[in-house]
Amino acid sequence: MTATASPSDTKGAAAPRISFVSLGCPKALVDSERILTHLRAEGYELSRRHDGADVVIVNTCGFLDSAKAESLQAIGEAMAENGRVIVTGCMGAQPEEIREKYPNLLAVTGPQAYESVVAAVHEAVPPAHDPFLDLIPPQGVKLTPRHYAYLKISEGCNNRCTFCIIPSLRGDLVSRPAGDVLREAEKLVKAGVKELLVVSQDTSAYGIDTRYATSPWRDREVRARFYDLASELGELGAWVRLHYVYPYPHVDEVIPLMAEGKILPYLDMPLQHASPSVLKRMRRPGNQERQLDRIRRWREICPELAIRSTFIVGFPGETEAEFEELLDWIREARLERVGCFEYEPVKGAPANDLGLLVPPEVKAERKRRFMEAQAGVSLKLQRAKVGKRLQVIIDEAGPGGARGRSKADAPEIDGSVHVASRRPLRPGDIVTVKIERADAYDLHGIAV
């Protein structure tokens, strides 16, 4: 995910100007929004171009080598076009690599270092704040369209997957108080947000670090617990979509909320693999037969449930037999939304010590076979929707029609619904669409 701050809502002539690039996952996007909100509250304006700014901030991603390369490229472009650059984010936790290539950066800070970023901006270009021109919207500065927003409920992660270095970059799990999360969500909904996308490194672990501590919300106390938070969010009148959910037993508790229509029947659950031996090397939950049984039970409770997952092929030591286990599992699981990545070594990850690297051409071939198998599953599931009427939230609209998403589709990572309509549609509208045609990943229909 790459996002650039838009200056469309800024005013004033003498205020210092900031250009901002946000790379990586939705959690990083929320970090970017917090930084921008703080700076806008101090009177800074946003510039669409690097060469029109007083300073450039690049929020980096350091999860994969390819993400690091993208971050370094973005830093290089900012240096070339402006020369006054502040770097933050996950890659900033390892500043030596950045400083070696770009020694003249103004500052390099790590993830979640909001105060350090703001301090670096102050040092580079002091604020010229005018409270009479302070028109910050109550929901803060957002890098997403106005009708949806990411809601981050915690930082860090307690898991120690061998392919991942996030805990070393962002630390252990730190959950936000439930009352704080709910107040932010309420503010977003009042500002016109129609869809809340709940994100963290491990959403289903929410509150474990606080022993499910309570905090005030409206006229009552609410526990910092996965089910309790999901239930309360479901009362705010917006679509609520759960991302990055581990397959813990207590996930079962939220499925009835989906069946009742309180939250979206959508579960983003990165499973990573299906072979018990590969999962053991990954240090991931390993009983996928039991997981199949749980998925069947979930679908009995909530037939509309859409499960999204991501998988890694070519993990060190992955044999053809282990890969075939994965193929068999996805054919049986019939997941609605699936992504697949070729394994990339990450500096500092324990998986690097496993040896037995899978050749690049084998990884590419396995990814092709995996996506081919999933496309067949997806096409059958999509065709079953032809003739049905689905609620669709509109993302883009024009004279030739509109594009939106069903309850089974998250922005940027899932499919779209292409909508023909006799009446004008606007982004953020939620309309009923009769599905007339289906592709492997997209649907086509008419607004009714």
Swiss-Prot record:
**Any one cellular component term from GO for this entry?**
cytosol
Listed GO MF terms: 4 iron, 4 sulfur cluster binding; aspartic acid methylthiotransferase activity; metal ion binding; protein methylthiotransferase activity
What is its EC class? transferase
The residues covered by the Radical SAM core domain are 143-380
Q: Please list the cofactors this protein needs.
A: [4Fe-4S] cluster
Q: Which domain of life is it from?
A: Bacteria
Kindly list the positions annotated as binding [4Fe-4S] cluster 2. C157, C161, C164
Residues annotated as domain TRAM: 383-448
Stated EC number for the protein is 2.8.4.4
Annotated disulfide bonds: none
Position of the signal peptide: none
Give the record's cofactor note, including how many are bound.
Binds 2 [4Fe-4S] clusters. One cluster is coordinated with 3 cysteines and an exchangeable S-adenosyl-L-methionine.
Q: Does the keyword Calcium apply?
A: no
So what does this thing catalyse? L-aspartate(89)-[ribosomal protein uS12]-hydrogen + (sulfur carrier)-SH + AH2 + 2 S-adenosyl-L-methionine = 3-methylsulfanyl-L-aspartate(89)-[ribosomal protein uS12]-hydrogen + (sulfur carrier)-H + 5'-deoxyadenosine + L-methionine + A + S-adenosyl-L-homocysteine + 2 H(+)
Family according to the record: Belongs to the methylthiotransferase family. RimO subfamily.
Which HAMAP family does this chain map to?
A: MTTase_RimO
Its function? Catalyzes the methylthiolation of an aspartic acid residue of ribosomal protein uS12.
Enumerate the NCBIfam families for this protein.
30S ribosomal protein S12 methylthiotransferase RimO, MiaB/RimO family radical SAM methylthiotransferase
Q: What is this protein called?
A: Ribosomal protein uS12 methylthiotransferase RimO
